[in-house]
Amino acid sequence: MNKPFSASILTLYPEMFPGPLGHSLAGRALENNIWSLETVAIRDFANDRHHTVDDTPSGGGAGMVMRADILARALDHSCEKHPDLPVLAMTPRGYPLTQSRVRQLSEGAGAIIICGRFEGMDERLFEKRAIEPVSIGDYILSGGEMAALTLLDACIRLIPGVMGKITSGEDESFETGLLEYPQYTRPVEWEGLSIPEVLRSGNHAHIKAWRQAMAERDTRLRRPDLWERYRSVQASRPLARNKKDRNEK
């Protein structure tokens, strides 16, 4: 039997977990041992009576910075228990989180996740430990806990056995490089608007074509960055196929 997906969370606020992940699909999966969760209280690794984990920023500036020595002790503790897990740090200075990276993580054994606070973490931690900095968007949160919950939710729902239908996640936004097509359900008529006729036609080919067209339209209008990337990938595919055909001849 495969080991459950393991999440080890380094945080100043262990009581924030599992939070919303204790409910719905993720909550049932946690109860059924499809994934496991542990929290590591960073303050437990401070060595003064006040459990201080931060200090003023070198060079001046507002706020406080999380200390590398204390974070490293907490991280080393978690890595000893989970030597095979990748280490991620939630920070607005990180690499953008993508659906492809989420899928990679969901197919692995789990992750150790460091939740940043204050003005951030001492940069020397990243220089001395193998840590992947991750950002969930171009905005600032009060701390990395909400970002960690978001990352975990995105991963957990892709673990086999969590979502009811095997193909449930395959047509969602970002899985194909596009935003997902619009969704409708009963009633057929609502406030003068009808469900598009094509979706009620029963013609699966027409429905598929309509959904593709709508996904492309919405991506082009709402996410021009994704649209340009999608067009680039689509344009390169015929070239790749032609090269493969020539090599096989």
Curated annotation (Swiss-Prot):
- Which amino acids does the record list as binding S-adenosyl-L-methionine? G116, I136, G137, D138, Y139, I140, L141
Q: What is its EC number?
A: 2.1.1.228
Q: Offer one Pfam family short name for this entry.
A: tRNA_m1G_MT
* Keywords, in A-Z order: Cytoplasm, Methyltransferase, S-adenosyl-L-methionine, Transferase, tRNA processing
Give GO terms: molecular function aspect only: tRNA (guanine(37)-N1)-methyltransferase activity
Task: Quote the subcellular location field of this record.
Answer: Cytoplasm
GO BP, sorted A to Z: tRNA N1-guanine methylation
* CDD domains, sorted: TrmD-like
Kindly state one GO CC term assigned in the UniProt record. cytosol
Matching PANTHER family: TRNA (GUANINE-N(1)-)-METHYLTRANSFERASE (PTHR46417:SF1)
Q: Give the HAMAP family listed for this entry.
A: TrmD (MF_00605)
- Family assignment from sequence similarity: Belongs to the RNA methyltransferase TrmD family.
Assembly mode: Homodimer.
The molecule here is called tRNA (guanine-N(1)-)-methyltransferase
Q: What lineage is on file?
A: Bacteria, Pseudomonadati, Pseudomonadota, Alphaproteobacteria, Sphingomonadales
Q: Which gene encodes it?
A: trmD
